[in-house]
Amino acid sequence: MAVRDGVVAWLGSDDVGRAQFPDATVTDLDGAFVAPAFVDSHVHTTATGLALTGLDLRGATSLRHCLTLLREFAADHPDGVIWGHGWDETAWPERSAPSTADIDATIGPRLAYLSRVDVHSAVASTPLRHTAGIADGAPLIADAHHRVRRIAREQLTAGQRAQARTAALDAAAASGIVAVHECAGPQIGGLDDWHELRAHTHGVEVIGYWGEHVGTAAEAHDLIARTQARGLAGDLFVDGALGSRTAWLHDPYADAGPECAAPHGNSYLDVDAITAHLCACTEAGVTGGFHVIGDAAVTAVTAALQATVDRFGGPAVARCGHRLEHLEMVTEEQAAKLGSWGVIASMQPNFDALWGGPAGMYAERLGADRAAGLNRFALLASQGVPLAFGSDSPVTDMNPWATVRAATTHHTPGSAISARAAFAAATKGAWRAGGVRDGITGTLVPGAPASYAVWDADAFDVSAPTDAVQRWSTDPRSRVPVLPSLTDDLPRCRQTVHRGAVIHG
């Protein structure tokens, strides 16, 4: 492969390349695997960096272990707010989340914010709750959670926030990722964080989405002008998350006890509000979208999209590239409609890897039957819904090969897709979801941006998921590109290049 001015200039055999470009600087990759670089279609950059530089609770194996990690971190960091992330009580023997009393008993009168792994609920120390004006005992979900998180974030210095962003983007580059879709909004990090991130200099490209509701085309134009966002989409919340029991469901949570105040989860936007936003964005020619997980939330968004199509027509809606984040509970009928309207599904296969299956968190929250219908990648792809894959980091790690593997090994038979389709969703599909629709970005062909990663991989194959029909030839003479075997030993990133510039390695 020859690269000139950040663009792929030529591909072919080694001897022809050396003859055609005799004065080129030659890098011998010594058998390494080169592929288009990844794009993560859903991240929270500052929060990811804070998880990397702060207290990481994702490895906690019990409530006691979680509190031990908190105690040790507090001792090592005696000043400032404690920012922690990643606890998941569903994997603990106690099956009990940490409480404010637990936090106070562990660290005393310090400010501490500890978000659950899905970042849709949290626990905080009493001093932080009081600073945020949250009553004792009130659950930290929805607006209360956003208020506590905002107060905790305000305790961080500009230097700490910048350090966190650099750590997050460095981690992306080290994972073979050259671009991320930042899903920001007034409830996520606020405008200050948004503007600081946009001003942050790094080799990883940040494509920003701003999740704030608008009601008219004029409001959409104004908000795009003020934020310079790629679209008014991303984490504009229709509902919450299944782990926190805040995703909006038609039927109650299977494990909702009598103390559960909202057994059907939470609805943050109704059909009329969703329709108003989509109509405003469509009229303005702007990408709109939402965070949508529960089946009731998907029903509401589908109804709103139907109303938007009825008003503006299918082609006008399709031109905008509206996108839905997560889209975990979708029916066959809904998938067909979304495909016909060109709606993009920005999904996270590692959600199924972590929480799917008959003994997983999804089954605990929903029961086995409903849980088996989550994250239906094959259904959506079969109905023409464009897929874009990401991590929702810090909810899951930015590990794109693990993402590809998860999409091919879905817990539910019939929901997996091939490795090649999953790879496309994590590269070309994610570029397309970000508004880049030239047909070549995310590939390595002459004229495409030279954005690629170099990997050490132990073995290669061309394979379909075990429950899918083979859709391309495995004969080497067909010259179909192979992919690394996605066993326990995933490929290791040696170098990442974006538009011809080395950003890692």
Annotate each predicted stretch with a short phrase.
Residues 405, 412-413, 418-428, 432, ...:
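C-terminal cap of metal-dependent C-N hydrolases
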